[in-house]
A protein has these predicted regions:
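Extreme N-terminal segment that seeds HTH/winged-HTH DNA-binding domains in transcriptional regulators
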Residues: 1-29
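Minor-groove-contacting beta-hairpin "wing" of winged helix-turn-helix DNA-binding domains
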Residues: 51-62
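Mid-protein regulatory/catalytic core that forms ligand/cofactor-binding pockets
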Residues: 66-150
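Key DNA-contact positions within bacterial/archaeal DNA-binding proteins
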Residues: 35
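Short, hydrophobic-biased segments on the C-terminal half of alpha helices
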Residues: 41-42
Length: 150
């Protein structure tokens, strides 16, 4: 498969996916290395494709029938799961987390969390990586972009 057709196949797969697609899954489906996919994604982005990287893989923005809003939140690390569960239990998808850093300015982490399973996976990644959520940089103060049904 030539590079141009492979990149088109990547875009097609991302357009039809209902979940983030990992570079490894794309590589296996296209019979190339993960590194080739990462390079293709970079070239697609440079060409204007709005591909976002989440902790679970790549996504394209979707047109939604719902409402997209940004909310401000403040909580402790221990309350992170409770916050996310409340949001997804009410039908919201948590698209990202945003903090205002005094040196770097606005930092955004892509989340794409829409179910309790996604919440569990996110919390497990935090525990397993021994990394702190972005909100801990600002004493728990952060923003979330939500997509909610009408």
């Amino acid at each position: 498969m030539e590079a141009a057709s492979r990149r088109q196949a990547i875009l097609d797969r991302l357009r039809t996916a209902d979940r983030p697609v990992s570079a490894s899954a794309l590589a296996a489906g296209l019979n190339v290395s993960r590194q080739i996919i990462v390079g293709d994604i970079a070239l697609l982005r440079a060409g204007g494709a709005e591909i976002s990287a989440t902790p679970r893989g790549y996504v394209l923005p979707r047109a939604t029938d719902g409402i997209t809003r940004t909310i401000a939140c403040r909580h402790t690390l221990a309350q992170t799961g409770q916050e996310l569960d409340i949001l997804v239990d009410n039908g919201c998808t948590v698209l990202d987390v945003i903090v205002e850093h005094p040196v770097y300015g606005q930092l955004t982490g892509q989340l794409q969390i829409s179910s309790r399973y996604d919440v569990e996976q996110f919390l497990a990644r935090i525990r397993d990586s021994d990394a702190a959520p972005l909100s801990m940089l600002t004493g728990g103060l952060h923003l979330h972009t939500l997509c909610c049904p009408n």
